[in-house]
Amino acid sequence: STRTPEFLGLDNQCGVWA
């Protein structure tokens, strides 16, 4: 993804930080 910690494997633009 765009960021390092893809917590749930979601290819979000922030890797699901919010």
UniProtKB/Swiss-Prot annotation:
Main location group: secreted
Alphabetical keyword list: Cell wall, Secreted
GO cellular component, one term: extracellular region
Localization annotation: Secreted, Cell wall
Domain of life: Eukaryota
Claim: Secreted is one of the keywords in the record: yes
Protein name per UniProt: 76 kDa cell wall protein
UniProt source species: Solanum lycopersicum
